[in-house]
Structures are given as structure tokens and as C-alpha cells.
Amino acid sequence: MRDRVAMMLRPLVRGWIPRAVLLLTVAFSFGCNRNHNGQLPQSSGEPVAVAKEPVKGFVLVRAYPDQHDGELALALEFSQPLAATQEFDTLVRLEQDSGNHDGGWSLSDDAKTLRYPYVEADKHYTVLISAGLLAATGSRLGKPRKEPVYTGELDPVVGFASRGSILPARGSRGVPVVSVNVPEVDVEFMRVREKALPAFLARYHKAGQRSSWELSNQGNSRKRLSELADPVYVTRFVLDGKKNERALTYLPIQSIRELREPGLYFAVMKPTGSFSDAFETAFFSVSNIGLHTRAYKDKLFVHTASLRSGNPYKQVDLLVLDAKGETVLQGATDDNGNALLNYTLNAGHVLVSRNGRDISILPFNQPALDLSEFAVAGRENPWFDVFAWSGRDLYRPGETLRISALLRDRDGKPVKPQPVFLRLKQPDGKTFRETRLQPAEQGYLEFTQKIPSDAPTGRWRVEFRTDPASKEAVQGLAVRVEEFLPERMKLELSSAQPVLRAKAPFTLTADAAYLYGAPAAGNRFTANLAVAVEQHPLDNMPGWFFGDATLQLPRGAKETIDITLGADGHLVHDIVLPEEAKPVSPMAVVVSGSVYESGGRPVTRSLKRVLWPADALVGVRPLFDVASGADANGMARFELTRVGVDGKPQSAKGLKATLVRELRDYHWRYSDGRWDYDFTRRFENKETRTVDISTSHTTTLALPVEWGDYRLEVFDPVTGLTMRYPFRAGWSWGDDNRGLDARPDKVKLALDKTSYRAGDTLKVTITPPHPGKGLLLVESDKPLYVQAIDANPSTTLEIPVTADWERHDVYVTALVFRGGSASNNTTPARAVGEVYVPMQRKDRRVAVGLVVPKQMRPAQSLPVTVSVPELAGKQAHVTISAVDAGILNITGFPVPDAAAHFFAQRRLSVDAYDIYGRVIESFEGGTGRLKFGGDMALPPLPQAKRPTARSQTVDLFSGAVKLDAKGNAHIQLPVPDFNGALRVSALVYSDTRYGQRDAETVVRAPILAEASMPRVMAPGDRSTVTVDVQNFTGKQGKFAVKVEGVGPLAVAEAGRSVTLGIDGKTTLNFPLRALEGNSVAQVRVRVEGNGSKAERHYDLPVRAAWPQGLRTQAHVLNVLAPIAFDPALAKGLMPDSVNARLSVSALAPIPFASVLQGVFEYPYGCAEQTASKGYAALWLDDATIKSLGIHGVTPAQRLERLEGALGRLASLQTMNGHFSMCGGNSDVNPVLTPYIAGFLLDAKDAGFAVSDAVLQKALNRLSEDLLSGAHLFYGNDQSEALMFAHQAWSGYVLARVNRAPLGTLRTLYDNERGKAVSGLSLVHLGVALSLQGDRKRGEAAIEAGFAKSEGGRPEVFGDYGSVIRDNALMIALVRAHGLAKPAYEARVMALGRDLEARRRSGWLWLSTQEQVALAQLGRALLVDQKKQVSGTLYVGKQREEIAASRLIGRSFDAAALARGVRFVPQGDVPLYASFEVAGIPRQAPVSDDSQLLVVRRWYTVDGKPWTPGPLKEGQALIVRVSVTSKQNMPDALLTDLLPAGLEIDNFNLGETRQWADVTVDGIALSERANAADIKHEEFRDDRYVAMLQLTGGRTANLFYLVRAVTPGTYKVPPSLVEDMYRPALRGTGRVAPATVTVVQP
């Protein structure tokens, strides 16, 4: 070889010397000519313009073969979009008689390209295009076209045809490979080391395409493939297949000697001559062992069967490997192929079964068999049980939650009395309260909790545990907390049609009545109808998809009925289905019917029916996780079936199944000052197959997919319908494991009885999908019975029922195994059957007699008699609940049933794992030939501060009442003044027996007077009080009706007289006007006649349509001259809202009192706000309240607020000790932790009960942050300064309890103090150093802190602070710890100047941090204050002598200010006086978009912009609020007050599904959560509130629904958005229209 290279080089060497001489000569000649550029040519060349005429009009641009991923289509591209309604199959044809397919030509999304997929490669086609082909513009092609197209050859492609990993040892032809135009492949085989099996199977879950990086990378602590497996063989295979045809070839690995050693092999394949980075991979073991396992609590049942015959496989060795490959357990199966191992399942372990050369491997990191089609659901079955109940499941904030419960074992029998730990959780999952309950007599538990008036709305949960540290609750009860009004009417919708048919009307029946017993005579009834594609028309077929999911239907609901009900409140109406409801797909037809109270408030119910387009439908069930999608570069697997309306299978012949891929053509566009991209869709038919379906079993379909969007289309030639199922491939990052290939075939099981008891014989009939050997098991949390069976159709077997079965989690399981054979293309399989075995418990349910009056009058006692003869002479109790049916109907709350709970089916507690879903399938195909061989992973937003109305909710409860010796109980329940219906329910319990019964009592007065009005009004609003008066006195009479307003309300035409017959009714409307004010007014209705009278009182809040503000004025008194309150401070404010305060002291003019009360009443409750409100409650003791002149704060309120803050903070604490900002999944900001921990220490020092666990966890967190360098605050421009501030504050809090290491504090001062940008962080560090003993460094740090320039602090720093907050805290800290110096006091005056500057710039907005800091400063100053002030206070002519104190404070209302307020001080000057006025302006705030742009728009329910005009009662609108911030705002708060006559349709309660598909400006309401980063939202009586995170420059869109309810004209409030921690950052939206008018229809 060396000689050959030398010979090749020799001529080059020989020619080198002469050439060198020549070059040297040339070089010298250039040097003589002095041409520095050598022979560099001049620039030349002329551009040639290519003449390209633009395409004009409607023409064919090109005809071409469109090939992608081995699939062909003829494509015709036109210059303009085509009209989509044409019959393309008649307008465009192939000249060759190839048999055009119906629906063969498909139109792309941009409508410019037609595609025809039914063509072959390497063929010439001629396409005939009709001159009549129509463009969307109306133009026609004009002349026929004849276009030749040559399809060319298919691109080469190859891959493994199966995702399986078990190759049957007997009767298998090898590993299947599918290919197109690939004649040969190179394959390398590697054997996985046994100890590496767990690591390998954790990384490689299934076959698929992998890159070289995936195969060799060692990232994320994973080993390279070479460290897991050894190369054993490399070879080349010659594949079958004709040119341009897909071929299936088996690689005959059984004949390769190097692959005969038992083990798991990994195969890597590539086409010969290919140098792509993508490799096809598969792994497999060759075995005849079928492995099935069943995992119990501490046992593992193993059954081994022959993959060839299905018979039991005897004496198979078993061993379990842990994650490191070490053997942790070994055993063997018996002669029946069974083994029961003492083993608890671990997902990181692998089970290896071996017998001779057979080896099967089962990793436990795969999902258990999917048994969702079996009735195996239920709750867990622990040793004890709790049945919890309440009278209702819907509460308003401020009401009292009452829960009852029974402690029993899992069969409803008594247990030894022991404490039960209850946890009340908020909607965000955080614990609100935790308490210990001790069972009373017969295991009865009772719990009550007042729901705070500022409680977050949503689903709360009550959980029970016997171990308070347990993460898992044994039982729970969900309740809803929402602002609602009880319904006054009931409405039932029904239809005799089980399904709908096209062109036939939907016959709707409606029955409406008042809950107090009168029919809804003359009431308005409306109904809206919405249609949508129904992909799940059969409830008994979960997981199956039907119909055409791509079908576009009109979004939103259409009004179909608007009618007045007759005298009986009954209606039968035929609704004509809309034109869009064509028989092309099953459709959900939803009717939403509403009956209206006289005042306009609706009661709404929905009814759904499914429109069937044909007698039978084709359905598909994806064999992958629907949410994650199919795997890319693999096979997407489906099951197909065809069923009738009754759900029974039907056969089908000649179904056309087509895999369609969606392709997107992206293009960039410049819009709104920036580049963005858009795309158009086009679709390619990838593969079409003909499929037959039988009635006995489903058909499986496997289709190759890459990464992207697809849909499966199945055309049924009998019905002419096409089922379309869209799906994605390759979108589930990090979830390349498993899918739903673990779904087994189904064995039908039928029991001979409905219930059993020990001693019975159970007979079970087995109907398998195929005959075979198998097992019959009885299981609970352990195997109770195992028997080998021969399963044939209708096989009946008997099993003795033993005492072990006397529980409620017993199931009969049947396993039937089918052997496999390559000769008949049968793959080994197992089928599973499950049926629950109910135990006989009828004798433990008792009959309950319940006697209540059918009708009674209000304000009387309701007599209830309970009789349970079966419990006579036995100890038993009963609880009675009587609840307004108008509350229960909102949620459909069922009657509590203890027997149904205790004896209910529990979930199957067995998880099954096996290898049958991973057996490599047998297909038809050729055998490859060896070419050569070789050897090579909320905040709660409590209701905003406003006057709040009391809403009457009737919920009566007796508690536990003991039955007498005869089994009877007599109970009286006091019924309030209320008209309606009470559902009276009784729950009876003894030690082991239970019963329940309910009845209804109508409550109504002789004269019924019920009023309707808005939930709230704003000053200036005009509305209507609607009063229904009905005569139930039993005789005709004349009745005087009087309506009056108390407070800021005016009622016109307040007195009326009406004559009513027996049971006669009239509706009266009284004009109502809201006057100026800000309080809870009342509407009082009084009706007298026929010797009876009725009087009703209704709270009606009158509140402004915008928020209040604070005005301040400060004075320095250098002489003892009288000072007077300037009435101008209250100018322009609503008098009823004015709250003025005068403060006089020797302290600086800082509004201590107002900020303390302001933060105490702050309405929202994130972590920082909760701690701040807690501070206010902590400091507002009696002495402070008195000295500051604060009104309206009682000791009880203070204690409730403080305890609520402590409980709320405990619920917000995370596992690592920090605190979640707003609960749930909201962010954690570490800078809050020292602030909150400091509050907890202060509360503890004040003697309040603080959870030591919460406090210690927070202190431990601070200690770790101080020692480890704290949080790095990535993304913050001042990250180092913020980290220093956090460490300094943490060190200060720890130093208070002597837990701050002095060495760490010194290091922080010596090395890091230069990073401080605020003086506060240095003061925190200095105080900490001083407390821990280093006074010298401490004083130096404090001095440096006060020397810091106030301007050095960034406006946005990330610590919720400000210059005002920092200055106040700095002074308060040094004073509190005796480190103050006179030089520092200058900051106090600076504070006063800052506050005055803010006041002069407009309203004085202060954040909660600023308010708390100012209050803390005030307390510190008062402690050292020696000077006192006294004087005389004059209010008008009233005089009050005020004794000397350090601070004088008094509060006044608008009337006092009008009379004149003057104070004559006494004391040593200088003195400081401050005047503060809080109130609501008469005029609306002007729109302000300087920081935030807030835009509110209104839309109709079909998503179109609403043109302002009168709204009809019941008319719904969609509200969209768009918020754009100029800067990032992580804590924005939107408050959108409603016009008074409108009410929110609460998404948590209402029938809103008919609006889900409505689209507003391209955003579907069902996707509204993605239109803004909403942390929490609430639907309140009079407002929509949302906390959200805003990103600078981007727009957030929020949506909610409103409905016009009460006639009148109402002011439209502006939308307000503010930063909760930087209140100066706010935006006020423009009001348009200024008013909204609601009219009667």
C-alpha cells in the first residue's frame, strides 16, 4: 500500500521544481513593474433582468406531483382561491380510467390547491379541468385545461414495524421492518447487560427513531448506551419489496447464532449507504414466556403462560432487580404457572423471568393495564371511614359552614373512639383551618366555621384524617363558596325524544312554578339552542370518538323561544333545528331554557340531546394518550368500531381509512411596528386502507407518523359519512413512555345475583373474545381465590363466598390467554374481565318515616316527626336539616345518604402489569436475507371594600337528636320570615344501620309579598322595585301596598291599592332612584288586607361606581393658636362617604391613624397583604384605638382579623418555608419571608397563638438563605443588591431570636455592604449586628444606611418597598432597639415632606407596605414621646375638653364638618396637626392611560360587537377587558364594577356551556384562560375581580358574561387596574357608553 501511494506522489514531485522556477520568475517581473494589485481584474458584469409577468386573473398556475414522506398526490395550484362548495370530482377528472374516488379531490386551507391522492408512483397522468371551475371571486376558468403530470418515484424510507419488545420464541418469523424503495439495511445488535436493565428501560421505553446524540449523550445523570449494552453482531439484510411499494420484511434473527444467548437486545438500523443522523431503533427479547403480574398492597401475583399456546408455563425463575441492577427478590412459579411474592411494587424495579433460553422482562415504570372501560372506580378502602354531610354545598362569604360526620370502619361499623383531624382547605389547596374533633355518642362529629366575608370564592374542601401528618385524606367533602341569590322559582326541562334526527323538530317540555307553590302563570320563558359536534354520543363508550371534529358550526346559541307561559306554567314546544344541523356528524343539541321572575331575574336549566345522522356510526379509539398525542416517528395505533344508536356493534365492509397530514406554510408579515408570522394550512393524504369490522371485536389500525398534526378519516360507504379524528404526533415532551398500549381485550363477566354474603355460592358466566386457557381470581387488597380455567363462550363457574369477602372492594377477575402463530398472523394476547361483587347490606338500611306539614306560614316553628320502628329499643340518632330549595336547586345538591356511602363500591385496588401489549405483532410479509456478518424525565380576592347586603339564606339544623324507646323523635325548627320551599331531610344512624328520608314543606304567608330589585345601585341610578302580591287568605279582598326606601333611596308612587281574588296575583312596579350615599339602604314592602299583613325588608347597597381616595393637610403649630378643619378638603365628595380625622401631637405630621385603619380594612389577601392586615389588627388594641380616635373596630373584629391572618399565612406557606404569593401555584418571592416571619414573632410576643411549626419553618428558611447566599433573584436588574437586602432582613429577624451567626453577619458587612442600594438593608444589618453583640460594626452599618441618598433607591427594586417605606422602617427600627441618634430624626421631617408632595400631586395613594411602615413608625415615636398635648375641641356649638395625652385623634362625618370643627391646643410647641379626609368623589375619575391602557368592550353572545342601545331583560353580553401595561406588572388587580341592572353569569355556577365555543376577535371563550395570565378571578355580586400578571407592551384579555336583569337606567363604572404594591401605577378605562338601559321585552 505504501509503494502505491509513493507512485501516485512521484509525478507531482517531478513537476514541482520547474514550476517553482517559473513562478519565481513571474514574481520578479511583477516586482519590476510595480503593480501592487497583480493581475486583479476590473469589476464587470451586467445584471440580466428576468422577464416575469405577474399572474393575472383566475388561472391554473401549475400542475405537479406533490410527494411528502413517501405519499403521493396530484396537485393543481390556482392563482385565486376556489369556491369550496363545488363538486370537484365532476369538474376535475383523470383522463385515464383509474376509477375516481368519491371525495378524492381535497381543497387546501388557503383554497388555492386541489390534491388527489389516489395515484401511483412512476406513472404519467393527464388531468382534465373543466372550464366551469369557479373561483371564490366568482370568476371561472373560462376554457378547459389538459395537464400532464408525471408522479416520479417515492422517496426511500424504512423503519421497524412494531413497538413491541417481546419476540415469541416459537412460530415467529423475526423482527418486522417496513420499507419503501430501500433494498438493503445495516443493523447493529447490542445485548443489554442484566445489571443495566433497569437503567436501560428507564431511558428507552419503546422503539422509534433516535439521533446519534440520543444514543451517545450522557446528560441528566444518564449513562451512554455503550455503558448499558455490549455490541454483539453487525450485519446487512436484503429487504423484500417492489419498486415504489411499501413492503413488510421480517429480519430472521432466530437464525443468528450470536443472538441466541437469552437477554434483551437493542437493534440500530439505517439504510445502506445512508449517512443521516437519524437511526431506527428497537429492542427485544426472544421468549416463549408470557408474563402477567398483579400488584397488591404488599404482594405481587405472577402468572406465566406460553406465548405459543396460552397454557401455563411451569417452573419459571423470577427475580426482581432494583434501579442499580441488584437482585432484591427471587422466586419461581408453580406447576400452575403462578407465584405469590412478598413484594411491594416499585416503579424503578424490573421483573425478569427466565426458563432455559426463554427470558421475558417486565419493567414496572410502565402504566398499569387500562381498565377504564370496566366499572372498577370508587374511593379508597382504608381501615376506617368517615361519612360527612351538610345541609347544602353552596355558601356565601360571611355565612357559617356546618359539617356533620360519622366515624366508622370500612363496613360502616363502630370503631373505638379516637380523635379525627379536620382540615378545611381553600380553593387554592392551602389549609385555612386545621382542628381536632373528638367523636360524640355513636361516633358523631360536628364542625362549624364562619366563612370570612372576604373569603376567596370557589370550591373549598373539608378533609378528615386520623393522623394529622398524613398527606392523604381518608374522606372529604367539597363545598362551594360563591356570591349567589337563592332561586325563587323552579324549572324542569324534558323531552320524550331519546335522540334527535335530522329534519325532525326537537320537542321541548317545560314546567315552571314558584317555590312557594304557585304556577309560573304569565311568566316569561325563553330558550336558546346551540349545536356542536358531539364526539362522544354514547355514555357507555368512554374513550371512543365519533363524528367529524373538523366540522365548522356557528358558535354561540340562538334564541328559539320567547313566550309567556300559560296559567299552569306548562309548555310544549317544537323547536326547529337550525339549518346547520345537517346529518353529517353526531351533534350535541343543547337547549338552555330560562323562566323569569317578575323582576327579571332568570332561573336557567339546560337539556341536551344528541342528533344522530345515521343509524350507525364509525368510531375510533386512539391507543395513545389523547392529551399527549401519538409518538413521532412511530406508529399511531387506533381501534375502529361501528355501533348503532343503542351502542351495539354492527359490522361494516369496505370502510376507507385515510391518514391525512396537516402541513403549514409559514410566512412573515410586518404589522403594528413589528415582524410576526402567520401560516396557511394544506393537507396531504398519507395512506389509505380498506378496513372491515365485525360485530364480535374491534379492528386495530396502525399508521406510521412523523412529528406534526394529523387526522384519521374513515369513510363509511353505507351511510356516506366520514369520521374525522385530528391528533398530534410528537408533542409530548418527556413522555415517550408507553401511551395506552396497555389497554386489554375485554372478557364479559355476568354474576347470577345482585348481592352476596358469606356462605353463598357465586356463579359467574364468562364470555371471552377468544377461547383459551386462563385464570379466575377473586381480589380485594389481596388475592382471595385463584383457579385455572378453560374459557369458552358462556362458560359458567361457581365460587364459594367466604367471610373474607365481607367488604366493599371485592372483584371477580378473569384472564384469558391466546397463543400466537406466525403461520396465521396471530399475535399472543390476553383478555381481561372485571366485575364488582356487591355484599348484601339491605338489612342494614332502615326505613324512615318523616312527617312534616305540606304547607306552613313563615315565622313559625316547623314540627318534624321521625319514626324508625326497626330501631325501637336501640340506641340511635337522627339529624334534621331544612334548607331553602332555592339554594339546593342551584347545584342540584342530593339528599345525604349514609348507607349509600358506607356500602358503596370501592375502587379495584389492584394494578396489573404484563408484557402482552409489547409482543411484536405478526403481519403478512417476506423474510429478509443476511448479506454479510460481523462482530461489532389565589390568591383569594375577598370582596372589595363596599357596603355589603345581607342575603337571606334559610338553613336550619337540629344537630344529633336521640330516638326514643319507640324509635321516634319530635323536633321543632324555627322558620324565619320566608316564602318558598324547604327541603326537610332526615338522616338516621345507629351503630351499624342507617336510613334517610326527605320531604318538602311549602312556606308562604296568607299575603305573599316578594320584591325584586338590583343587587346594588350607584347614586343617580334609576331602577324598578317589582313586587309580586298574591292573595292566599282564602277570600277576595282589597290590599294596600306600600313600598318605601330607607337610606339613600327614593321610591316613587309608593302607595298602591289592589283587589285580588282567591289565590289571585298581581305584579306592581315602583320607580326607584338611588340618591347620593355610600351605605346599605333598605327597601321595605308592606301589604295589608283581609285582616292579614306582610312586611318584608330587603338590603340594597348603594355604592359609588368608583373608589374612594384620601386627602390630607398638615400644619406646624409654633404658637398655640386655634386651628380649624378646612371644609374644602371634603369638597366634591359624597357626604355619606366622608370620614374625616384630626390628629394633634408633638410628632411629625404623618397620617398614622388613617394608614392603620386603611390597611386594617384593605380588601385583598395575598401573602404580603395578609401579613400587613395582621399587623394592623395586632396594633389596633384598645389604647391605640382610643388615642387615635378610630371608630368601627371592635375587639372581636380585631381578634377575628388577626386569627384569620395567622391561619391564612399558614395556608400560604410552602414546603421549603417560604410563602406562596397568592396561594395555589402562584410564585414564591423570598423577600416576603423575613417580613412575614417578623410579623409572626411580633404576634407571638404579643401573646397570640402562633403555629410554632409555621414559625420555625420560616426561621429555618431564613437561616438557610442567610448561610447559603440566599436566592439569586435571576432576571432582576438589581439581583446582587436584592440578595444583600434579603440576607440583611433575614439576619435581623434571626437576630431577634438569637439565631443569626455573628460570623456570617460580619462577613456580610465586611465584604458585601457595597452592594446595598437602599439604606434600609444596611440598617437591618446594623441592628442585627448590634443584637448579636458587634455594636461597633452595627452602628457603622446603621450610620452608612442613614447616609445613603434617598435617590439611590431604584423605583422598581423587587422588595415591595419605596422611599417612604424605607425611611419609616429605618427610623422605627433604630428607635425600637435603642440605636437612634438625633441626626437620624431628620428623616421624620423628610417623610412628612414626601407625603405632602404626594398629596399635592393628587390623591394620596399608599401601598400596604407603606401604610404598615408608617404605622410602625408612629408606634415607635409614641413610645419615646414625652411631650403631651391637650385642648378644647369645638364641633359647631358643642365643646369637648380633651385631657393631656401624647396624641389626640378624633373622627368626624360630613355633618360635623359642615357644622365646623375647631381645636384650641395646649402644650409645648412645636406641635403638629394633620387633617385627613377619605371619601368618594361625586364625579367619576377621568380616564387615565399614562401607565396602563384599560379598554372594555361589549359583545353579543355570537361574538359580534354590541351596538349600545336598550338591553332586554334576560339579554346576555360578553364583556372583554383588555389591559396593556407599559412595564412589567406582576401584581396587577382588575376591578370591573357592573352597571347595577346587570348581573354576572357565574362560570362556577351557571349553565354557561352554550357559550364555550363563542369566539371574540379570534379568542374562544373556552380558551379565555390563555388570553391573560390570570392568577385568580372571582365573580361577585356587583363586580368582576381578577388578579393577573402583566408583561410590558403586551395586552391581556379578560372575559366574563353579564345578563340584563332589572329594568332601569344605570351608570356604567370605569374599569380600574392598579398595581397592588405600587398604587401610583394605575389605569382608569374610558366609560362608553355612560349609561346602560334595561327594558322589559
Curated annotation (Swiss-Prot):
Query: Can the keyword Signal be found in this entry's annotation?
Result: yes
Where does the UniProt annotation place the signal sequence?
1-31
Entry GO CC: plasma membrane
- SMART domains (UniProt xref): A2M, A2M_N_2
Kindly indicate whether the keyword Disulfide bond belongs to this entry.
no
Cross-link for Isoglutamyl cysteine thioester (Cys-Gln), residue positions: C1166-Q1169
Name the lipidated positions (S-diacylglycerol cysteine): C32
Q: What does this protein do?
A: Protects the bacterial cell from host peptidases.
Family note = Belongs to the protease inhibitor I39 (alpha-2-macroglobulin) family. Bacterial alpha-2-macroglobulin subfamily.
Q: State the protein's name.
A: Alpha-2-macroglobulin
Tell me the organism's taxonomic lineage: Bacteria, Pseudomonadati, Pseudomonadota, Gammaproteobacteria, Lysobacterales
